[in-house]
Structure formats: C-alpha cells, structure tokens
C-alpha cells in the first residue's frame, strides 16, 4: 500500500551517498562469519523468563537493561527469524499490561521482585512514553511474520487505538494536534542536550507519563513523538483494512494526514531544511538523530526526504556522516558531545542503525543501507575487544562502555553477515 503519496511512474533508482569501507580480506571474512553461530547464541541467551509473564521467555535489551522496553520492540521483528513465539510474546505482554486509560508501559522489568533493584516493586512502568517505532506497526508486522490468527490483529487494533486516544487526551496540544515531550526519557535520548536543557527531568513528575513538568518551555511539541503518532495512525488504517473496517480505515488515514500537515507546519524550519521540536518560546534547534524517526515512520515524501538527507547525511566528515555514520547528534552541531558513555549526545547508537534498516530501502537508499551495515562490520573487525556494546565512537568505531551483548548490536552483526560478501559458500 502506498502510504507516502508517491507519484506513479518509473521506479526511482537507489542513490549511493554513504561510502562503504574498503573490501574485507578473505581472512577477515572468514573470521567474522565464523562468529555467526556465537552471535546467534548470544541473541537467544538474551531471552529470559519473566515472573509477570510466564508463558514464554521474552527478549531483553541486553545485560544492562534487564527487561523489555517499548522502544526496543523492533528488536522482536528480527528475533522472529530465530524465536517466533518469544517475538510475539512481547506483543502479547504489552497488550496484557496496557493501562486502563490506554497507555502502554514503557518497560516490563525482569527483576522487580529483587530488593535493591532500580525497578523494585514495579512489574510494569508508566513513568514516561519512550516510543519510537509505533506499537501498532511493530506488532502488526510481527503478527504477519509469525502467522498469528485474525483475533490477534483485532487485539492489536484495539490496543493501538486506545494508545492513540491516550496521546490525544494527555499529550496532544490543542492548536496543532501534535504530541508534547514532557521528559528526557520520553524519546529514549538519554543524556542528549535536546531533551535535558532547561531543567527537563528524566521521567515525568510523580512517575506518571500523564504529568507535565512545571517549566516555562512546556509543552514542547516533539518531532519524534509526532512521527510515531503519524506512523501509528497509518498502521491503524492498515489494521482496519485487514479487519474489514473500511470506514474506520478512512478515518485513521484522515487523522494521519492531519498529523503530517501539522508536522510540516509547526516543526519544519525552511531555512535550515530541518525539523525541530517547538517550545512555547519557539524552535529548539538541536540537530539530532530524531529526524531519522520521521524517516522511520515514512512521514516525508520522497522529495522532502531527499532535501533533508542530501543536506545532512551525504557529505563525508560532516553532520551525520562521520566514518561510523548516524551519530546521535550531528558532529557539526554545537551541542555535540564526544566520548561520554551511554550518551545520545554524540555517540553512534546501534538502535539508530538498526531502525535505519527499515527506512533506507523505502527511500531508495539501499546502497547506503548496505554501506551502513558494512561500517558496523568494519568496527567489529577492527575492534576485537568489542563485547557488542550499545554504541560506537563515531570517528574510530571503537566500542564505548562495558556492556555485553546489547541486542540491537547483535542484530546488526547478524544482518550484516547476510550480505553477499559474507554469505558466499555458506547458508544464510
């Protein structure tokens, strides 16, 4: 289905702008491909039994994130190739623990019964939103991939519609209809100046995502939450189509179009050709990877995408194209911070790159998709000390932090290992 209003005609060819690293030597190819079984085992070792959901093991984000996170839900799309019941289990768990007002938990912690644990006493958490790839889209694609019955698509539809309603009633600003960001973790951008400057708290007041902090700039209309709202509405329209709810499908598409137009009207800076959050005082001009979430949710037309991408993602050594691409903040932005652990203030994040696999091909950047995966593979080759941490130095590819087997990083390795130069002579 055409959800991005492309004109009919000859298919646009892929455009190459992201340079792939030098070819891997035969020895490097052999060394890297030999690790595939080990990495697959590490991925499956991240499955764990959750006391609040005993039906099937669920996929943790990694050793330093012992739980399932809503912002990590796309990890389950890839997991479905290895453990389909567990991939669906996370969707079922989020639906089961959805709050009565429609809010999904941002996390289901694993060790909530353990005294001294950060999440002690919380088997589900509603402290902030932390949504990126909409639940409606992710759950629907996983349900398709794992062959779920129609009743599960109906559950997804009901749950996602209630979630949309929660946003409308608790986060969407009246004039624009766009959702506001209330706290740092709403968007998952830990330690990014974009979501901390001005005294913005980590979580919402009272540990409840309904509550807006009493700050002069609030509410702050959020680019990425607006993108997720749009993407969720397009997915809801597709679900309604599947369920034979044609009138409701049309309503969701109309709502999505209103969101798309509002994003353009309120959040786009024509001079900068960039999308910014808008506070009561005006644009908050941080050039961060939040713009890729417009790509992820296919908010932009091809022409709009090309304008942003070619200005900010196509010049080597500038903006979002350092040697290890897609840093969390443009390397030319004054707020860029280098070398800080667990920082969306500058480091190249595995989550950003994993999500890019969903949008690069759609926007005719398939060659860049391959080049991005090869850059990650080059980092694994050149830094054998890597334990599959969550982030890289954008200039050297060196792993940052001491985490082990972060799920998105494992998945990037496995996806890169499917590229032709690594699959010759072995089954995928």
Label each residue range with its predicted role.
Residues 2-14, 180-181, 190:
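Short Lys/Arg-rich cationic patches that frequently serve as NLS/NoLS or arginine-rich RNA/DNA-binding motifs
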Residues 132, 136-139, 226, 233, ...:
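TPR repeat positional signature
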Residues 79, 138-141, 232, 239, ...:
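Core register positions within helices of long alpha-helical scaffolds
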């Amino acid at each position: 289905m055409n959800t991005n209003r492309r004109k009919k005609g000859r298919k646009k060819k892929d455009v190459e702008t992201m340079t792939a690293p030098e070819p891997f030597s035969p020895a490097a190819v052999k060394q890297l491909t030999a690790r595939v079984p080990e990495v697959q085992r590490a991925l499956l070792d991240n499955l764990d039994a959750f006391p609040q959901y005993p039906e099937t093991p669920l996929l943790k984000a990694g050793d330093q994130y012992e739980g399932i996170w809503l912002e990590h839900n796309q990890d389950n799309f890839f997991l479905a190739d290895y453990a389909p019941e567990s991939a669906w289990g996370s969707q079922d768990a989020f639906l089961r623990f959805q709050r009565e007002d429609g809010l999904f938990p941002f996390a289901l912690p694993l060790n909530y019964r353990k005294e001294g644990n950060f999440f002690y006493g919380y088997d589900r958490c509603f402290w902030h939103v932390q949504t990126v790839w909409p639940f409606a889209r992710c759950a629907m694609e996983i349900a398709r991939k794992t062959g779920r019955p129609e009743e599960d698509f109906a559950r997804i539809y009901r749950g996602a519609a209630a979630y949309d309603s929660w946003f409308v009633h608790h986060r969407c600003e009246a004039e624009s209809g766009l959702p506001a960001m209330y706290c740092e973790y709403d968007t998952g951008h830990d330690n990014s100046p974009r979501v901390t400057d001005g005294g913005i708290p980590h979580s919402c007041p009272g540990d409840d995502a309904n509550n807006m902090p009493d700050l002069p700039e609030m509410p702050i209309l959020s680019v990425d939450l607006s993108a997720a709202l749009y993407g969720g509405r397009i997915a809801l329209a597709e679900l309604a189509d599947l369920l034979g709810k044609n009138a409701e499908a049309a309503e969701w598409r109309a709502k999505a179009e209103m969101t798309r137009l509002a994003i353009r009207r309120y959040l786009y800076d024509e001079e900068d050709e960039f999308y910014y959050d808008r506070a009561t005082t005006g644009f908050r001009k941080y050039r961060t990877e939040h713009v890729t979430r417009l790509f992820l949710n296919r908010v932009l037309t091809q022409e709009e995408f090309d304008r942003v991408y070619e200005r900010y993602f196509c010049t080597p050594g500038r903006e979002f194209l350092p040697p290890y691409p897609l840093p969390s903040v443009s390397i030319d932005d004054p707020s860029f911070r280098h070398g800080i652990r667990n920082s969306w203030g500058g480091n190249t994040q595995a989550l950003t790159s994993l999500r890019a696999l969903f949008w690069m091909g759609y926007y005719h950047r398939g060659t860049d998709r391959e080049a991005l995966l090869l850059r990650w593979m080059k980092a694994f080759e050149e830094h054998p000390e890597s334990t599959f941490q969550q982030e890289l130095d954008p200039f050297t590819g060196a792993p940052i932090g001491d985490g082990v087997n972060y799920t998105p990083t494992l998945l990037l390795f496995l996806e890169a290992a499917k590229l032709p130069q690594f699959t010759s002579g072995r089954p995928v």
